[in-house]
Every structure is written in structure tokens, then in C-alpha cells.
Amino acid sequence: MTNTLGAIIGFVVYLLVTIQSNGSEQRIVAQTILAEARGDGRAGMYAVAACIKVRSQKRNLSFKQVCLQPYQFSCWNKNDPNRKKMDFLLTLPQAEYAWQLARNMDKVNTEVINQATHYMTVKLWKTGRVKWARGRKPVAFWGSHAFFKL
């Protein structure tokens, strides 16, 4: 009986940790999608989710790790104005779709952005101020973003 109870408790703890970590992973992904593309409609949000997935596959990192890598998604940079709004973003009407994407990242089709690994606003790209994008042509455009394969 004691072994059975211990096994049950161990399994419940395992489930709780798994659920909590998945929730945390999905939350970070949903927040990233919202911060980066909430004004670009579903297509723009989907494109950002696809970029997260491409980076995850290429770098062999979890979606959360990809989102939180320094200087990869500006919304997580310490001085970015979106950083302070991350929890608030989850209250927006677009959050439902962001959560849906975050829960179903395995189903996101990365071909919609031609396997792009990077993106920026079209406006910023046209300024030529970003070194890594100089002389590069976008492989896709979604919402206000240009997507690049580096």
C-alpha cells in the first residue's frame, strides 16, 4: 500500500510539474507572439509563431528558450517598452489566438515564411539601419514584417 501511494504521489507531482512547465512555455510563446505581432492580425501572429518554430528546430532549443534568448525578440529586451506590458497583453482580444498558436506549435507550418529565421518591421528594414539585414531581400512579408532567411 505504501509503495502504491508513493507511486501515485510521485506521478501526481510529475503531472503537476509537466503541466506547470508546459503552461510556462506556452505563456512565454503567447506573450511573444502578442508583443511582436498583435497589430498584424492572425496572419502576422501566425508568421511570428512560424519563426519561433524555425529557430527552435534549427537551434535545438525549446520554444521558450528561443523566445527568451537575448536580443532575439525585442519584446524581452530589458529596455523594450513591451517588456512591461507582457502580462497585460494576455488580456487583449488577440490573446485567445496567441494561446491557440502556443498550444499547437507542432502544427504551425513554417513554409508560410519560407523557413525564415529572422524578421523586422518593413519600415525598419527600409531604413537600412540594421546591419544583418543590409543587402538582404526578404523571403516573405506578413503584416508589417519582412522575414529573412539567414
Located regions from the model:
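Low-complexity, intrinsically disordered regions enriched in charged/polar residues
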Residues: 1, 5-7, 23, 67
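Bacterial extracytoplasmic/cell-wall-associated proteins, especially those involved in peptidoglycan
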Residues: 19, 24-150
